[in-house]
Amino acid sequence: MSPKFGTSGLRGLVSDLNDKVIANYVQAFSEACPTGDTIHVGRDLRSSSPKIMQAVINTIREVGLTAIDHGALPTPALALASITAGHSAIMVTGSHIPADRNGLKFYVPSGEINKTDETAIVKALKRPQSSSFQRGIYIETSSALNTFITRYI
Protein backbone atom coordinates (compact mmCIF):
# COMPACT_ATOMS: atom_id res chain seq x y z
CA MET A 1 0.00 0.00 0.00
CA SER A 2 1.44 3.38 -0.94
CA PRO A 3 1.04 6.49 1.22
CA LYS A 4 -2.12 8.56 0.68
CA PHE A 5 -2.11 12.33 0.42
CA GLY A 6 -5.06 14.59 1.23
CA THR A 7 -7.09 16.00 4.11
CA SER A 8 -4.24 18.18 5.39
CA GLY A 9 -1.44 15.71 4.93
CA LEU A 10 0.20 12.41 4.14
CA ARG A 11 -0.71 9.09 5.76
CA GLY A 12 0.60 5.58 5.27
CA LEU A 13 2.23 2.48 6.64
CA VAL A 14 5.42 3.32 8.51
CA SER A 15 7.28 0.92 6.22
CA ASP A 16 6.17 3.00 3.21
CA LEU A 17 7.14 6.36 4.73
CA ASN A 18 10.82 6.06 3.91
CA ASP A 19 13.25 8.99 3.73
CA LYS A 20 12.75 9.44 -0.04
CA VAL A 21 8.94 9.61 0.24
CA ILE A 22 9.21 12.05 3.14
CA ALA A 23 11.77 14.17 1.26
CA ASN A 24 9.60 14.32 -1.85
CA TYR A 25 6.54 15.56 0.05
CA VAL A 26 8.45 18.02 2.24
CA GLN A 27 10.24 19.51 -0.77
CA ALA A 28 6.98 19.69 -2.74
CA PHE A 29 5.33 21.45 0.22
CA SER A 30 8.20 23.93 0.47
CA GLU A 31 7.95 24.70 -3.26
CA ALA A 32 4.16 24.77 -3.60
CA CYS A 33 3.00 26.55 -0.46
CA PRO A 34 3.86 29.87 1.18
CA THR A 35 6.30 28.49 3.73
CA GLY A 36 8.56 31.51 4.07
CA ASP A 37 12.10 30.71 5.17
CA THR A 38 11.24 28.78 8.34
CA ILE A 39 9.27 25.60 9.01
CA HIS A 40 8.41 24.46 12.53
CA VAL A 41 8.47 20.70 13.11
CA GLY A 42 6.93 18.58 15.85
CA ARG A 43 6.02 14.97 16.47
CA ASP A 44 3.71 12.75 18.44
CA LEU A 45 4.81 9.92 20.74
CA ARG A 46 4.62 7.03 18.25
CA SER A 47 7.82 5.00 18.13
CA SER A 48 8.20 5.70 14.40
CA SER A 49 7.88 9.48 14.73
CA PRO A 50 11.47 10.44 15.69
CA LYS A 51 12.94 8.83 12.55
CA ILE A 52 10.31 10.40 10.30
CA MET A 53 10.81 13.77 12.00
CA GLN A 54 14.55 13.59 11.35
CA ALA A 55 13.87 12.99 7.65
CA VAL A 56 11.55 16.03 7.65
CA ILE A 57 14.18 18.23 9.34
CA ASN A 58 16.94 17.01 7.03
CA THR A 59 14.86 17.84 3.96
CA ILE A 60 13.87 21.29 5.26
CA ARG A 61 17.55 22.08 5.74
CA GLU A 62 18.52 20.52 2.41
CA VAL A 63 16.15 22.89 0.58
CA GLY A 64 17.80 25.85 2.32
CA LEU A 65 15.17 26.63 4.95
CA THR A 66 15.38 26.93 8.72
CA ALA A 67 13.95 23.99 10.69
CA ILE A 68 12.69 24.71 14.19
CA ASP A 69 12.53 21.42 16.11
CA HIS A 70 9.87 21.47 18.83
CA GLY A 71 10.25 17.78 19.69
CA ALA A 72 7.25 15.86 21.03
CA LEU A 73 4.18 18.00 21.65
CA PRO A 74 0.43 18.08 20.88
CA THR A 75 -0.49 19.02 17.32
CA PRO A 76 -2.41 22.15 18.42
CA ALA A 77 0.70 23.39 20.29
CA LEU A 78 2.77 23.21 17.11
CA ALA A 79 0.01 24.89 15.11
CA LEU A 80 -0.24 27.70 17.68
CA ALA A 81 3.54 28.25 17.67
CA SER A 82 3.86 28.37 13.90
CA ILE A 83 0.79 30.52 13.27
CA THR A 84 1.83 32.95 16.03
CA ALA A 85 5.30 33.21 14.46
CA GLY A 86 3.86 33.57 10.95
CA HIS A 87 5.62 30.41 9.77
CA SER A 88 4.66 27.08 8.25
CA ALA A 89 4.81 23.77 10.12
CA ILE A 90 4.94 20.03 9.62
CA MET A 91 3.63 17.74 12.36
CA VAL A 92 4.65 14.08 12.34
CA THR A 93 1.56 12.35 13.67
CA GLY A 94 -0.53 9.30 13.06
CA SER A 95 -3.39 10.91 14.97
CA HIS A 96 -6.15 8.32 15.25
CA ILE A 97 -4.89 5.79 12.68
CA PRO A 98 -3.45 2.37 13.69
CA ALA A 99 0.03 2.16 15.25
CA ASP A 100 1.62 0.59 12.16
CA ARG A 101 0.93 3.85 10.29
CA ASN A 102 2.04 7.44 10.62
CA GLY A 103 1.83 10.66 8.71
CA LEU A 104 2.59 14.33 8.17
CA LYS A 105 0.22 17.25 8.73
CA PHE A 106 1.13 20.41 6.83
CA TYR A 107 0.44 23.97 7.98
CA VAL A 108 0.95 27.25 6.14
CA PRO A 109 1.34 30.48 8.15
CA SER A 110 -2.46 30.95 8.25
CA GLY A 111 -3.27 27.38 9.41
CA GLU A 112 -3.83 23.91 7.97
CA ILE A 113 -3.33 23.49 4.25
CA ASN A 114 -6.49 23.60 2.15
CA LYS A 115 -7.56 21.85 -1.06
CA THR A 116 -5.81 24.46 -3.23
CA ASP A 117 -2.57 23.85 -1.31
CA GLU A 118 -3.02 20.07 -1.63
CA THR A 119 -3.42 20.40 -5.40
CA ALA A 120 -0.29 22.57 -5.62
CA ILE A 121 1.71 20.02 -3.61
CA VAL A 122 0.58 17.17 -5.88
CA LYS A 123 1.62 19.22 -8.94
CA ALA A 124 4.99 19.98 -7.34
CA LEU A 125 5.51 16.26 -6.70
CA LYS A 126 5.28 15.66 -10.46
CA ARG A 127 7.98 18.23 -11.29
CA PRO A 128 11.69 17.41 -11.14
CA GLN A 129 13.02 18.12 -7.64
CA SER A 130 15.69 20.81 -7.41
CA SER A 131 18.88 20.05 -5.52
CA SER A 132 20.86 23.29 -5.70
CA PHE A 133 20.27 24.87 -2.30
CA GLN A 134 22.46 26.22 0.47
CA ARG A 135 21.92 24.13 3.63
CA GLY A 136 19.45 25.69 6.04
CA ILE A 137 19.65 26.29 9.78
CA TYR A 138 18.55 23.99 12.62
CA ILE A 139 17.04 25.36 15.86
CA GLU A 140 15.86 23.21 18.76
CA THR A 141 13.31 24.60 21.23
CA SER A 142 10.69 23.57 23.74
CA SER A 143 9.03 26.98 23.99
CA ALA A 144 5.92 25.96 22.01
CA LEU A 145 4.89 23.36 24.55
CA ASN A 146 5.45 25.77 27.45
CA THR A 147 3.45 28.51 25.69
CA PHE A 148 0.62 26.07 24.96
CA ILE A 149 0.49 24.87 28.58
CA THR A 150 0.55 28.44 29.91
CA ARG A 151 -2.24 29.47 27.54
CA TYR A 152 -4.61 26.70 28.57
CA ILE A 153 -3.80 26.13 32.24
Where are these regions (language model features)?
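An N-terminal, well-structured beta->alpha segment
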Residues: 1-58, 62-63, 137-153
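A short, terminal or domain-edge coil/loop segment
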Residues: 16, 88-98, 122-132
